[in-house]
């Protein structure tokens, strides 16, 4: 047994977007599958984003008597993390294939809220890379 056999082979997760009611794969106008690719939680890119967000929160809490974290702040940090760890996408939104930016990713994940859950589930499923 080689320990390298028990490590992931890629630092990305490609999530095929499915219709929220029928679970059918969604297609773009060109016939390609709609996909969103994100960095995996063990990747250096993902860790850099999480560390930056945590460091920002730690710095903001320094010197304060309370380090309370509101639900709104938690939700915003989660959205920021997802937007910044989205590597690429192949989606149709608003009749076009939008350029991936952090702001556009936040917009898509907010407006088409069920996609966020699919991406999060895809990442969670990818962590089972060692299963037989």
Per-segment meaning from a language model:
Residues 2, 8, 26-27, 42, ...:
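Exposed, low-complexity/repetitive linear segments and helix-based recognition motifs
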Residues 91-132:
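C-terminal charged interaction modules
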Residues 3, 46-57, 78, 82, ...:
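Generic structural signal of hydrophobic/aromatic residues within well-ordered alpha-helices
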Residues 49-89, 93-94:
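Negatively charged, Asp/Glu-rich surface segments that serve as flexible interaction/assembly modules
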Residues 35, 39-42, 47, 67, ...:
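Intrinsic-disorder-associated interaction segments
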Residues 1-61, 128-132:
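Short, charged/polar N-terminal "headpieces" of proteins
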Residues 23, 31, 63-65, 86, ...:
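Short, flexible coil/linker elements and helix-boundary hinge sites characteristic
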Residues 1-4, 87-89, 98:
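Flexible, active-site-adjacent loop/turn segments at secondary-structure boundaries
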